[in-house]
Regions:
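N-terminal loops that bind phosphate or other acidic moieties
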Residues: 1-252
């Protein structure tokens, strides 16, 4: 756990203290952070990926903890893709109808006030994102740099992954989606990444909760690929398959 912007001056037991400052600013009134602060948060994420690589980890997962950060994630998604507010904004951990309308207004106002440049992902995140998103972008970038596969968690993690891919398209080659988030904007992020989640558990929870599930599936898949016998090894006659090898025989 890395603290790069929790809104408290107290030390968090067990957390790595890399606080840039206490929280970001109100995105409905101005940009969340400076461009330099965004880059600093990304560099912290890259550093965390580097540390994990040097400690011998061969797969990483990215999650976050926060309240209200589906609002910033929706704002970043709109800023990166130009999609509509209704397509990007969901109900997060659960809110009233009135709060939902306010949430959509905040995202709309954040885009109107800040005018993020969709061609500059750092500008988008600096203006309407958060330190958590910027830090996760850095982890995705760092994982790709050190050639370590990395698991996407939920909606917020997916938006960070999309921003990282917009910075460097090669990052996509190291991404592994985990669970399908119930947040409406998640599908847009996956479509933009041209990826599909492994499983759908009707979860609207981030915080890295999908990563351990994906780790297990990856481990099982590797075990099957490395240890499962081929037809030749098992001395199975596969001549009968010649008639059905064409792709058209497998597609309904």
């Amino acid at each position: 756990v890395v603290d790069i912007g929790v809104n408290t001056d107290k030390k968090i037991p067990g957390a790595i203290d890399r606080k840039i400052r206490m929280g970001t600013y109100n995105i409905a009134k101005g940009q969340a952070m400076s461009y330099d602060e965004c880059v600093k948060a990304m560099n912290i994420g890259i550093e965390m990926a580097k540390n994990a690589y040097e400690e011998g980890y061969d797969i990483l997962g990215v999650g976050e903890m926060g309240i209200g950060n589906t609002t910033t994630s929706s704002s970043v998604l709109v800023g990166l893709t130009g999609c509509g507010i209704e397509e990007a904004v969901g109900k997060g951990a659960g809110i009233t109808k009135e709060a939902f309308e306010k949430k959509k207004w905040v995202v709309s106002e954040a885009i109107r006030v800040n005018k993020p440049n969709k061609n500059d992902p750092v500008d988008v995140v600096a203006k309407v994102g958060g330190f958590d998103i910027a830090g996760m972008i850095g982890v995705f970038l760092g994982a790709a740099y050190y050639k370590v596969p990395i698991v996407i968690d939920g909606f917020i993690s997916a938006v960070a992954a999309l921003a990282a891919v917009r910075i460097n398209p090669l990052v996509r080659e190291y991404l592994i989606p985990s669970h399908c988030s119930k947040e409406i904007g998640y599908n847009i992020a996956m479509r933009e990444l041209n990826l599909e989640p492994m499983i759908n558990l009707d979860m609207r929870l981030g915080e890295g909760s999908g990563c351990p599930i994906a780790f297990s599936i990856v481990e099982f898949s590797l075990a099957m690929m490395n240890n499962m016998a081929t037809f030749d090894e098992a001395e199975i006659n596969d001549d009968y398959l010649e008639e059905v090898r064409g792709e058209e025989n497998y597609i309904v």
